[in-house]
Curated annotation (Swiss-Prot):
GO annotation (BP), single: response to hydroperoxide
Annotated family: Belongs to the UPF0246 family.
Species this protein is from: Fusobacterium nucleatum subsp. nucleatum (strain ATCC 25586 / DSM 15643 / BCRC 10681 / CIP 101130 / JCM 8532 / KCTC 2640 / LMG 13131 / VPI 4355)
Endpoints of the signal sequence: none
Disulfide bonds: none
The protein's name: UPF0246 protein FN1762
Lineage, opening ranks: Bacteria, Fusobacteriati, Fusobacteriota, Fusobacteriia, Fusobacteriales
InterPro entries: YaaA
Transmembrane segments annotated in the record for this chain: none
One GO cellular component, as annotated: cytosol
Cross-referenced Pfam families: H2O2_YaaD (PF03883)
């Protein structure tokens, strides 16, 4: 089973695995990443402000990081990303078995790196899929390469589990790759709706559960009960597993 996951805007330059015996890996799309960095590095600070809608210290730091990209520290992807979903991962408590599961099963989609394995060495960045820095847009820049890569690493009949946000799962070509979507909804007065902050946390908790319990098939997935969420069979179908809970 392979799992796709979203990156986060929040990042840190801290490698929590520095003193562990882990084999770090190289990003698969370094050439394409360098193309994007080259494009960004030619932009003025005013152009970066307009493209990224940033101001003040965040703008200055982002511009500085772009100009000094070569000097930035390499951090494994799973340690670098530090947003809401990633904070639900109990990384420092993971056993050797859990770390191996992460290494073998997780793919983090990204605007700058395409698709990264958990222990690929990356550098911090700021870039969204909707930002216009290439003629055809970032979705088109990445789509073929990411789909070819995922198709190649999936074994025959292996599941691709979608724990990514819609912004990033749109990268996947459903005609080329069969995917099981996981979604989380809150029930209130008989209606169901997705609430962004809850969904982000739930995706992180769900991934954490998969890793710690070495989940490898759909039969195990539909039995998961987590943080009040259960599979909702009325809302789910063979390609979309909807987990719901009552909003108290």
């Amino acid at each position: 089973m392979k799992i796709i996951f979203s990156p986060s805007k929040e990042m840190r330059e801290e490698n929590i695995f520095e003193n562990k015996k882990i084999e770090f890996t190289e990003s698969k799309f370094k050439d394409k990443t360098n193309i994007l960095i080259k494009i960004l590095s030619k932009k003025s600070i005013n152009e970066i402000e307009n493209i990224m809608k940033l101001k003040g210290e965040l703008l200055n730091n982002t511009y500085k990081d772009i100009q000094n990209y070569d000097k930035l520290k390499y951090i494994p992807a799973i340690s670098m990303y530090y947003g809401v979903s990633f904070k639900e991962l109990e990384l420092e408590d993971y056993s050797e078995k859990s770390l191996k599961y992460l290494k073998n099963n997780l793919l983090i989609l990204s605007t700058l790196y395409g698709a990264s394995l958990a222990f690929d060495l990356l550098k911090k960045y700021r870039l969204d899929m909707t930002m216009s820095i290439t003629d055809k847009g970032l979705y088109n820049f990445w789509k073929k390469d990411v789909n070819d890569y995922i198709s190649n690493i999936l074994n025959k009949d292996e599941i691709l589990l979608n724990l990514a946000s819609s912004e990033f799962s749109k990268l996947i070509d459903n005609k080329k790759i069969s995917m099981i979507n996981i979604d989380f909804k809150e029930e209130e007065d008989g209606t169901y709706k997705s609430i962004s902050i809850y969904s982000k946390k739930a995706r992180g908790k769900f991934l954490n559960y998969l890793v710690k319990n070495q989940v490898s098939n759909l039969e195990e997935i539909i039995k998961i009960e987590l943080d009040g969420y259960n599979i909702n069979k009325d809302l789910s179908d063979e390609k979309n597993f909807i987990f719901t809970r009552k909003n108290s």
